[in-house]
């Protein structure tokens, strides 16, 4: 089988495509060399020499690309070229707009200032097209055989055109500036040869990636024209949805200033676009249908975008993976949203279902994959790529993952802002990055010198200390009543910086504190977070001991504790009572208090025991209740 495949392979055609790739590389390298010369503030002898050498390769590549393209000159070629150039300008600018969501000075209509008109590659592309047309005319005029002059075995196809058109995105001024900055850093460090090798390899990889994307898009156009569902159509739609939802996700957490000199950290946008594309494409491959999957993704992406925006505005925190447990409390969730918004979403959902049903049997009807083997291979490939993005985060040490990995190493390692919380990380590193850390990061970092012996030694130390303290202690906590009253709205304004009050607003509480044992509790947020305060109160385990990727201790930490020890262990089950004026299922409370042996848990809903004679203050249950 392998031998037959080897013999049937058109190696001549493959060699021609490799030659096309080489021509594309020299074309791109010349564009990079020009950017290096124009942008560097260092002595330019090295860069000038590089520019002169690359110019020779550029001229050869112009001739070579024209020669190959002459076999495919047609009206369709000019239309495809125009479509790719215009589409790339729009996509590139859309990405730029997304990357400046945190820049309140960015004006999307200042097209010239924002370098929307990126025509760097256009003159060269026009030269290639004109030369290719002239070559075709001359070949026809002189009746020259098509396989003469080195084109023997060459079979021009869509990928050939895609390889040539890949020089358009490679010439993007923003991409060239990014590459040249990395190149200049290595050159200044005296590693010019290493820099040359790395940048050359990067250009080749980028050419192949861009050529593949263009090939898929051009194939999708062909299949759309023939009303044929295909993997290319699904992949193109996935990329389009990723570009749209990348914007809407980030819009929900946008700010108005730079952080560490960035409005969005390098790699954040690309990471999120790739992540969304992979998820969407996997959905298409699994369902093997176009329209139902498309509308499902549209609805899901819209809901995530809206909820993310609402949660950020209400709680200063983005939508997190752990928030999806609230799906079991849809009634409570919808109570936070205006009825008009819910009605609009329901109507939109109904319209989507009707349209999907109508289109399903008429436009792009049928399966995306007819072959189960190809479909399974696609699923496997997508899973492998997805895992390659997730696995490195699972093996991080001291907040750092393996260096040298494309996109994710720089995104995770270069700027450590985990301590700034979920909102800041989502704003500058993307919502997808925050979600990735949530599903991959360990709940607690392993401390230095951690071992069973070390823990036993610490336990022995404090056991002895407890015995010494309890020698003269007359009272036993088990014989006393302990009440924790946690109020989200209670705090002392005297402790808030830059705030002055005309008189003491908590005189009674301060008087009680002065006459008994008293202290302060650390709150990790301004209002809210009561469930986390409950966990810390019961277990004496502070929130800051856990990973920065942890959001809700009851949902993420408690279920993984083999034997959670709490202060409630000093009391019999019948004397353990909890009250919370909301749903018992919120933040996993019902399960937690059940596992801790509480005999009663009073809640507004979801529990056996409920509050009576409820009085509200505004929308919330009063203290009197």
Residue positions per predicted region:
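Solvent-exposed soluble domains appended to multi-pass membrane proteins
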Residues: 467-473, 487, 492-625
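N-terminal secretory/membrane-targeting segments
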Residues: 84-91, 130, 160-161, 297-301, ...
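Surface-exposed loop/turn and secondary-structure junction residues enriched for glycine/proline
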Residues: 145-147, 152-154, 322-324, 336, ...
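Beta1/beta-strand and adjacent pyrophosphate-binding region of the FAD-binding site
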Residues: 483-485
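Envelope-exposed proteins and targeting segments
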Residues: 478-481, 533
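Ligand-binding pockets and gating/stacking loops
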Residues: 113-124, 189-207, 233, 327-332, ...
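Extended, compositionally biased non-globular segments that define protein topology
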Residues: 1-322
